[in-house]
Amino acid sequence: MVRLIGVDLPRNKRIAYALTYIHGIGITSARKIIELAEISPETRTDDLTTEQTIALRDQLESIDLNLEGDLRCFNGLNIKRLNEINCHRGKRHRNNLPVRGQRTRTNARSRRGSKKTVTGKKK
């Protein structure tokens, strides 16, 4: 099992898709990293040699991106700042409602939680 930046990569996936398990790396940046590390895109995670793993680790450290814990902390601080300045987006985050203008009269179930049933009117 390959471990990069504190993340265990899945065993039998192509390396480009395995790198997307690292928070902050999408498929496009994963392909660029693989290209810079001079690794074939068809290589599976199990088939990586130690030299290739070291090359991947070096590329991940050399790119100027926030990854994993740093990125999560950065996003958390941004949400905390929105809450502190009491703006509309901060209030939506605080109340666990959709932030980007989606409707809430119907839908938005994943953000608002499961349905709260109300008993019907008795006759």
Swiss-Prot record:
Keywords: Chloroplast, Plastid, Ribonucleoprotein, Ribosomal protein, RNA-binding, rRNA-binding. Residues 102-123 have a biased composition (Basic residues). This is Small ribosomal subunit protein uS13c. One of its GO terms (cellular component) is mitochondrion. It comes from the Eukaryota. The gene is rps13. GO terms for biological process: translation. The keyword Ribonucleoprotein applies.
